[in-house]
């Protein structure tokens, strides 16, 4: 009971929100999405609200739905809301608002405003604690983002099992990957349920978003798939049960999802899940049907495609092909269903779905109201969407439906006809026939029954009938008999129909009769029964039209083939059996002729039989003229042009009957027969021609029937025949049939649709045949057609208008040109009407699509100037226009409307011209130029661009000009050309299209009429430069290329013809292009300028282009790249010639009266630049070209060839250029910048030469008296040698041969700068070529070391000379020895000079040390001791000089230490140590560095040999501390300097020890000990302490570095150390350093006493015997007490800190080294004396009177406990009394530390000391 109560109380405490628990409140308040905990904890709710409300306001601007929350969770009152104070109902209401907001904000969580807003929900309402599930699900789609990581950090630790998947990622502070979430959804039902519920809730709220639905769809689909996979089982029943359970869980979610049609992504996600279910679960048909209906009922326009894919997948899983009714209806309602299914079929299997659609189309055929489904069925087969097996199944479905259709009732005639046509397609199509034949062969269909049902013939062998088939057929016949009997019975009461069945379209009785006749077809008995019906009046058939007109209408109508053939057979039977042979049955002729064109051979055969029967009656006719149904065939008062009987007989006998056999075979034959008959040409050898009157009569007879016939199926067939005949017997088809056309025109669209639907003829076919009535041979054919649409177009059907214009278009080419002109005028006038009328649009389309003659186009063009003149007449008076701004025409609203019409008219005309292949009509050039003039004038008046019109005009002109260019002579009168207008188009328009067209036109005109164009051409190039050249499209590039290709050559030729200077004459052109450079796309610049220069002539114009570019852009990088590219394309002679002309231009620009430079560069003009600035830019660019072009390579290639003429030419031009450069140099010496630039050119020019040629040229130039020139060429040589000079043998020899010239300059020249340049050249030569022949360089070295060079007073020559000697030393090595004496003496003197006070020269100083470095490296043995002494002394002086750099000096000293003999180096150091110390810390450190390097870099043997001098140096250095101390205030080293130097000294000593063995080192050690302990008088206490300090510091390093192998050396120092411990104190400044050194020395000595371990000596030579040194009682007893007594120095906080830091570690290490219980007990006994403040047991003071001493002792105990652990605590019984006393100590620090020690002991022992201490 108690435990249960405790558990309840703990739960209550865990959930408690006690307001007094401030810590918990602060923790909760610091939970934040965007702020760090520390920051969040400092924020109040006002601050948080202000930040979050800003985000909320931004959200409201994004979506107004957020504003609803402004009154609730984001109100001012919300700041005071505390969930812990709200009631349960209030919290529930709050949860609703919070969840609604979270749902809405979920889609925007990656936006800062949304995160700020949610922050308020976290901080104020703590949604992460109270609405955890909803919050997690809101953030879950963003599980990969840092935001989700922030949420994880603030979620409660005790997450529910629903979200247990997140727990490890919350603990690890990492984002969860996708896989665990999918796995959780698969295995954790609550998680998946929560996710589904959340998604549906958000979607119902219309707050769904892509991130959520995409996440959910992916997770849910994978989860369902995973669940189904996991439920696989070897036992089918178990697996089925598990699958059913999963389906039961999933279907409600899908049902809810499908219900939300407007949430398209949710619906698509449900489709995905449905697909997974269908593919992975064995679903029952019921479930599949339900899913399919749900899918079909859920789709919208957005989801149709996905829905169809889903249906296709579901259908594939169905064993049956039948689709559920709702799904089928949804599919059939779709627009373009076949197109959609075709697109899907490329990626998914759709065969079952298509078979289901096929089955649905065939379902319940008798009850189908229309043929829409059968139409779809036909299209499925036509598009062949099914594979062969599925196609066979589909055909089987069609045949099954046809076979069983009578069971459900009679099929409509339309449906029967459609199915019959479809089966005919099966049997006749090349692609479908094999499959159909196979289907028939493999099935047991009764072909005869199928043919009977469809009233058609199936072209296949009937399968053998089985007994069962026969029985079935009997049953079917019985059922058919019942249907026929009932039909006949219903008609038996009908009286004779009053008129002809052809009199009107809609006759209900006829429909009933036709249905009954269809049932009778196939049975003679039934047909006989049917023909005896009273309604048909068979007995009165010769007198009244009912009987025959019925069968005429049937065989002429849209009925199955069998029905039509039987109807014809009935007529034939009647004709052959009639007794009245005097009747004229010519009324049958039009219908029978149409029947002969039927696609079915059977129908044609029956029609031929009927015609033969009529023909036989004519033969029997003796009386004639009694025409059957003459007055009432089509009703009363029909104007039929009946034929006289004998004429009819002639037609039959001469035209029709002879061709019947051919007509049976070929359906098109009768058309040819009638065409030839009516034209008077016989096609049959047995037939004879008809005379013209008879042909006329026959033609008018047929035409009148076509006009009067009310039925459109036979009318259409008759028209199809008649429309082959243009004329017959003096009349035309148009004349005869025009009434029919007018009648047809009068029908409304509804009437036409009704007519065509009833008779199943396409409207388009009828429209086309009607307008085909008008023949092109009719003189006014086009006008007749236009007359049928023009006056009353608004009331006409659009389809009729389209047909009329289609006919006009079709016959246009066959109409005479004069009639075309008239028609075109008419069409044009109509085209100017209201543009939205169908008639106007059709007229315009027609004019655009037909080939208009040139005369028509010319007339149209003449209208443009007239129209614009009329338009100007609408403007204000000329005076007012002149005074108005820009002469603009002011227009009223009415004027604007008129202006719009004029513009539309001009646009249409120019579009017609443009689309009529204007190149084939050169006569249009005049009109087009006039139109261009008018447009240009009008454009300037109205300030409008009119770009489109100009573009059309220019385009047409361009086409004409381009065609004209192909012929030798212009194809039009060139006097009409207006080049000025074309140029103005280029200049004044902003349209790129107009500009390009105008440029191309100028280019073309310059070819065919250059004299008319070139005077206007320059403005074009000016404009091109500012506009066209900057364009980067391919067309503009082509335009520019053509303009350059065609205009420039013509321009140059014109200038030459006029004997003008071509360069100055084209300056404007060049200026245009150079000015445009910066606007031309970078990748096109080179190609464009190259094309321009090539067309102009590279040799003549390249220099000008280069100069203009240089003048305008100076050293612009892009320009330089272009210039380099241009010159690199030229040959070497051309490039050099260009440079020569370029230099000539520079010279010209600097003249008082410039010539061509004024034209090209603007020198001397008002807006021109200063000549000097121009010259500088040109020369700098030229220097760049010399350096970076390929001239050097090209010249070398030429010189390497054997072409003497080419070589001579190059040398001549090069010499000329060199002379030009030198001449310019002489003339511009006073112009500093120009002179410098000219020098750069000279340098670059020389750079094009080989080194040998260069030196040859230099030798000549050095003979000139001009020192500036001589200096310049030597500097050029130095620069050339500094880079990568040639290394070939010839070059090397030539360079060395040049050395005497340079030596001579140094010896004899008074020009210091010239000498300097010569030395620099020698330096380069020695470095690059000295090793080739060192002996030739030595003489130069001697001169450099002489008075003539480094012996001069000028520092520049001195520095250069010393550096040169350094280079020579590196190159020549020992060969340089002859020059060494003088070089050393002078260089040392120069170094000393550079260090004199007030004359410091750092550059000279560095140069000398560089020389010494080189000498030390290459010939160290030549540096004597006195030289080394001098070098060291000067280096000491340099170390103290402020203006000197340290690097060169230090480098030289390092080289001395490394390379010079060790004895010489150490001897020099030993001799000069005192001077180093006098120089100060820096010099001393550097000297020690020399010693260190010498020891380190030389072998051990050298160290051993020089141990005496080395020891001398070390003892002098060790005494530095004492010496400085003795100097007192005069000391030059402070304590830090001494410490630093001693550290370096210790390092040197250790390095020395490494190279010694024990035998060698031990005496030195003992000598050091003696030196430190007894080397001074006893009175010199301070000196002794100083030496001991230095020595002990060394020992500290000694023991610390060499460790256990030198522990034995401690025996030498114990006595000294004990002595020091008794005297030195950390409290005494004079001995503190010594005391510290002692402590550290002992610590290192104790620390590395590693007894028992195998030890490898660092130096194999230093073999020392290792013993258990500090464990020995003699050693331990000697040192332990003095060491522990050091604790007594802890008398105040300062000394206590020092003792604890230094003495305690030493004591600890001693205890570790002692390593035995007895030793530890002895140490502890000594130590505990300092723990007791009172007197000991014997009454003597214990030593711990001072609390600081006790504290230090406690620290020692703590350290020992920590280091030794239980080993030390074996002495605990002895310690316990002391601990008890110390726990009662008066000093708080002591008491605190003893308690720490107690805890430390307890931790080691694992038990409490309480019992032991009591």
Curated annotation (Swiss-Prot):
Annotated InterPro entries: ARM-like, ARM-type_fold, BP28_C_dom, HEAT_type_2, HEAT_Utp10/HEAT1, U3snoRNP10_N, UTP10
HEAT repeats: 583-620, 1042-1079, 1249-1286, 1293-1331, 1770-1807
Biological processes, Gene Ontology terms: maturation of SSU-rRNA from tricistronic rRNA transcript (SSU-rRNA, 5.8S rRNA, LSU-rRNA); positive regulation of transcription by RNA polymerase I
Transmembrane intervals: 942-962, 998-1018
GO MF, any single term: snoRNA binding
Stretch forming the signal peptide: none
Disulfide pairings: none
Keywords: Membrane, Nucleus, Repeat, Ribonucleoprotein, Ribosome biogenesis, rRNA processing, Transmembrane, Transmembrane helix
Membrane topology per record: Multi-pass membrane protein
Pfam families given in the database record: BP28CT (PF08146), HEAT_HEATR1 (PF23243), U3snoRNP10 (PF12397)
Subcellular location(s) per record: Nucleus, Nucleolus; Membrane
Main localization, broad class: nucleus
Gene Ontology CC annotations of this record: 90S preribosome; membrane; small-subunit processome; t-UTP complex
Function, as annotated: Involved in nucleolar processing of pre-18S ribosomal RNA. Involved in ribosome biosynthesis.
Subunit structure, interactors included: Component of the ribosomal small subunit (SSU) processome.
Recorded family membership: Belongs to the HEATR1/UTP10 family.
Name of the protein described by the UniProt record: U3 small nucleolar RNA-associated protein 10
